[in-house]
Amino acid sequence: MSLSSLLWAFWYILPAYFANASPVLVGGGRPIDGGRYWKDGRRVFGDGKTWRGLIGGVAIGTAVGALQYFITPEFYGSLGKALLLAFLLSFGALFGDLVGSFFKRRIDLPRGSPAIGLDQLGFLISALAFAYPVKTLDSGQIIFLLVVSPFVHWGANYFAYKMGWKSVPW
Amino acid sequence: MSLSSLLWAFWYILPAYFANASPVLVGGGRPIDGGRYWKDGRRVFGDGKTWRGLIGGVAIGTAVGALQYFITPEFYGSLGKALLLAFLLSFGALFGDLVGSFFKRRIDLPRGSPAIGLDQLGFLISALAFAYPVKTLDSGQIIFLLVVSPFVHWGANYFAYKMGWKSVPW
């Protein structure tokens, strides 16, 4: 495992990180569950998961992929492949986040409360799974991302909290 | 991704699953933190993490690896490599679990309360990282294990709860 292979792993996953972080900035609006309740009497996803956050996050992540293609075209091969990869990483990240919210509501964690592990890893695993058919990393790079992403995630959230973008530091 | 490659992924990770599950059966005894408190006034790991659970779990996981070698020697190459791999997978799994307990105590989750995600993925990621230098999987197999392990984990814990081995179903 060379240093450059670890940097390429971050470069690969960047759209997923942007998509996962962007609802903090572009979120709000109509909730995806339309205010509906699950059969346990609790919200399906909650007010924290909105269409604007989902669509905005996928758009931002995919735009990041377009920028990445123009910086390192040889890493992607073609603009079409770069855009498809970034779309799948972004959609995968937000889909994983949504599934996480579903499980958090089911065990009755209130919106915004931490699910230590799920919040830091669910979006990443989902992004890796969605993007796998188009382009993947080697196993060492994946293990590296899994080990360091929780710390990146906590650092980024603490920064967003200090900047006043989030009301809680996780 | 063929079916057999997914079955090999389970076969590879089996010592980690056994090590992670075994403290339920062989646990108890003297806690690893010796009853000591962290500077936040809470226990370092708590009474749930004991020397007997750690050593018993590593022993059971490594014994599983020895059995695996005699069933599929060609997968490991040599008994020494199979034992080393099983030891690293088992120790890695329990080390990840211990780190998870440390973080759970820091955010003041009581012993046994669920950290959705961390409990299902922390031991797995740690096992994969420790075992990586000896033998690893391909990226598709790793992503597969990450996606399905939470469900295996929940199923196994629910079974242990129904059998009366655990007091809570998670």
UniProtKB/Swiss-Prot annotation, chains A, B:
Q: How does it sit in the membrane?
A: Multi-pass membrane protein
Transmembrane parts of this sequence: 6-26, 53-73, 83-103, 114-134, 140-160
Q: What does this protein do?
A: Catalyzes the formation of CDP-2,3-bis-(O-geranylgeranyl)-sn-glycerol (CDP-archaeol) from 2,3-bis-(O-geranylgeranyl)-sn-glycerol 1-phosphate (DGGGP) and CTP. This reaction is the third ether-bond-formation step in the biosynthesis of archaeal membrane lipids.
The entry's protein name is CDP-archaeol synthase
Q: Which reaction does it catalyse?
A: 2,3-bis-O-(geranylgeranyl)-sn-glycerol 1-phosphate + CTP + H(+) = CDP-2,3-bis-O-(geranylgeranyl)-sn-glycerol + diphosphate
EC number(s) in its UniProt entry? 2.7.7.67
Against InterPro entries, the record matches this protein to: CarS, CarS_archaea
Q: Which cysteines are joined by disulfide bonds?
A: none
Q: Cofactors per UniProt?
A: Mg(2+)
Q: What is its main location?
A: membrane
EC class name: transferase
Task: Provide this UniProt record's keywords sorted from A to Z.
Answer: Cell membrane, Lipid biosynthesis, Lipid metabolism, Magnesium, Membrane, Phospholipid biosynthesis, Phospholipid metabolism, Transferase, Transmembrane, Transmembrane helix
According to UniProt, this protein's pathway is: Membrane lipid metabolism; glycerophospholipid metabolism
One GO-annotated biological process of the protein: glycerophospholipid biosynthetic process
**What domain of life does the native source organism fall in?**
Archaea
Can you list the GO cellular component terms from the UniProt entry? Answer: plasma membrane
Membership in a protein family: Belongs to the CDP-archaeol synthase family.
Q: What GO MF terms are annotated? A: CDP-2,3-bis-(O-geranylgeranyl)-sn-glycerol synthase activity
